[in-house]
């Protein structure tokens, strides 16, 4: 699968690379798991509602979430820092 970071999510990822390598490792593990099993697996995947209808969330930790959408053979990452706004 191909990973596509959307605007803010790439900035989030770069933030973690600079400030917390532990979160980068966790995000990479989640992305690898998503490519194998998009809607089950690590990080307690759950479908989102309202403005994020069609998207899924996985826990990075208690505060931060990885929000993504699977389209064909692409994983679109929308956020990987904070909760949904």
Regions found by a protein language model. Name each.
Residues 2-4, 8-25, 49, 57-65, ...:
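Enriched for short, Lys/Arg-rich terminal
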Residues 24-32:
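PIN-domain endoribonuclease scaffold, especially VapC-family toxins
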Residues 32-59:
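A short, surface-exposed loop/turn module that caps and links secondary-structure elements
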